[in-house]
Amino acid sequence: TCIDDWRSLGLGPSTPASSAVSASSHVAEEGVTEPINLRTWTLDDLDDTQTTTFVSASITSGVQNGKLTAKVFGYDIYKKEEIEKLAVGDKIAFHEEGAAQDQCVTTEVKSIERNDQHHFVSINGGMEQPGGLDLKLEDDDTYRTMTFDDYPLYYEMGEKTMPLAEDVVLKDSSADPQAEAVETTGADAVAAAINADPDNWTTYNTTLVVQGGKVLEVRRIWVP
């Protein structure tokens, strides 16, 4: 169950929520608008051999013995039609900044502002307010959370150690905003590149492409 209200966290989103349950055992609460990916994706899905998954990640300890350890992050996504019919008095579930995957909170919608020109929705005064949330139309049929500089509002899904594929490719365009991606191929060369700059692979600039539990690509972009 999502925590009934943001206030019940007491000490804020960094406090573990004792009443939270794992995503796999979660049951949707009637009358609450929930993220569509709340119950449908876990770290175990990265081991799926039939699916290629793109994840935002923070590489925490470089590459050791051909394996990298990364904190994997997600963000809340909602069906467009559910956000468009959301009204004052309804409830919405989301992850606050710094939350873990199982620390979903539910809050009552007390105010809602819509910017149709830019496809923004601000709930309860936006993310800077307690129980507030900002949403952006991501594509034709989903909204996602939004924070400063247009980033999603990330929550941590957990840490996972994964081997680099033998033919792994690093695409690194982090040098400057206009930089062309510099490609490095092969597990040893990619490991050396990551380990040469160990502290600069973060949620905001790093994407891992994973299939069957192996890292096929590492992508890093420039961020301010």
Locations of the language-model features?
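N-terminal Sec-dependent export signals
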Residues: 1-33
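Solvent-exposed hydroxyl-ligand-binding patches built from regularly spaced Ser/Thr
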Residues: 23-224
